[in-house]
Regions:
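RNA pseudouridine synthases
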Residues: 1-338
Length: 338
């Protein structure tokens, strides 16, 4: 059954305003029977986080057939739900102005080229100076959107493109598109070892059994699919182009290490450095000094969340990775001349 509800707030292209009321009227579908109230509402109103909906329920802003229910109460389907709630900013993460490379912006989204070394979300050991802090300084209204509008993430030392939703509606649509694998995310990586050709790694990923900060290929892990192809071969390394089909934690790093081609500089999965015979001093120095995993989110393609128009962006590798590629190419050319 199609969802039936009405909303008095602005369109998806309107920016949310703190303190603005959101009035919803909807009928829960028969398929909601047996679900908790908060679960049923999360399905019907995906533009809001479940935590926000639970807060509204606890505050008495949600009425079901004219009466108040608890979030854990089960629904039957067919109930009339009325919501009169005020949007409140999430003030747990503070705004901190930092330089950001904004590749694209419109009323619905930003596309950011994240530098290496920047953490995406605050957490243990990184309470501030993250991308989320910087986004809140760039646009304070992002405090009304879950995780300041961040739809996906990159590891701290991975550089490249990220999409950020500026409205609740855009966030819901982009999260749904990511779940349906409708957002294309392409990376470049420099791996140890010379690949003979491209391929696909289809291997589930889960938390490492002994080292909880690591991920590993595990039979009981979550589905993880990575496509890769050779872009350039060097004497002992390969430049590869990678496309994610799923988006598990450390997925590219784990999958490439799993097939025997770990990413240069990866402090967790790369193991010992391997140098080609007769390695030039320049290459030895470049490999020894490279400070991070050589992984960059180079291309992002998606349908705009409000217009549906197909959009794509590309970002060249940052300076440190570009220098390493240049040294690898020079080493290869020198070897071919001798």
């Amino acid at each position: 059954m199609a969802r039936e509800y009405s909303e008095s707030a602005g369109s998806a292209t309107d920016c949310e305003t703190e303190g603005e009321f959101r009035n919803h009227s909807l009928v829960l579908p028969p398929a909601a029977a047996g679900l908790r109230l908060d679960q049923a509402l999360a399905r019907e109103l995906p533009q809001y986080s479940r935590a926000r909906l639970q807060g509204w329920i606890e505050a008495g802003a949600v009425k079901v057939d004219g009466r108040q229910m608890r979030g854990k109460d089960k629904v039957l389907g067919g109930e009339q739900v009325q919501i009169a709630a005020r949007l409140e900013a999430d003030d747990r993460v503070v705004a901190e102005a930092q330089p950001l490379a904004v590749v694209h912006q419109d009323r619905a989204l930003f596309v950011i080229n994240k530098p290496p070394g920047m953490v995406v979300h605050p957490g243990a050991g990184n309470p501030s100076h993250t991308l989320q802090n910087a986004l809140l300084a760039l646009d304070p209204k992002l405090a009304l959107v879950p995780r300041a509008g961040l739809v996906h993430r990159l590891d701290k030392d991975t550089s490249g493109l990220l999409v950020v939703a500026r409205t609740l509606e855009a966030h819901a649509r982009l999260v749904a598109a990511l779940g349906e694998r409708e957002i294309e995310r392409n990376y470049i990586a420099i791996c140890t070892g010379v690949m003979t050709g491209g391929g696909t790694v289809d291997a589930p990923i889960g938390r490492h059994r002994a080292q909880r900060t690591r991920m590993a290929v595990r039979n009981d892990g979550r589905e993880a699919v990575t496509h890769y192809r050779v872009a350039e071969r060097y004497r002992a390394h390969t430049l590869v182009r990678v496309q994610l089909e799923t988006g598990r934690t450390h997925q590219i790093r784990v999958h490439l290490a799993h097939i025997g081609y770990p990413i240069i500089g990866d402090p967790v999965y790369a193991g010992r450095r391997r140098l080609p015979a007769g390695c030039s001093p320049a290459l030895t120095a470049a490999l020894g000094a490279f400070p991070r995993q050589a992984l960059h989110a180079a291309r992002l393609a998606l349908a705009h969340p409000t217009t549906g128009r197909s959009l794509e962006w590309e970002a060249p590798p940052p300076e440190d990775m570009a220098r390493l590629i240049a040294v690898l190419e020079a080493d290869q050319q020198q070897h071919e001349r001798t």
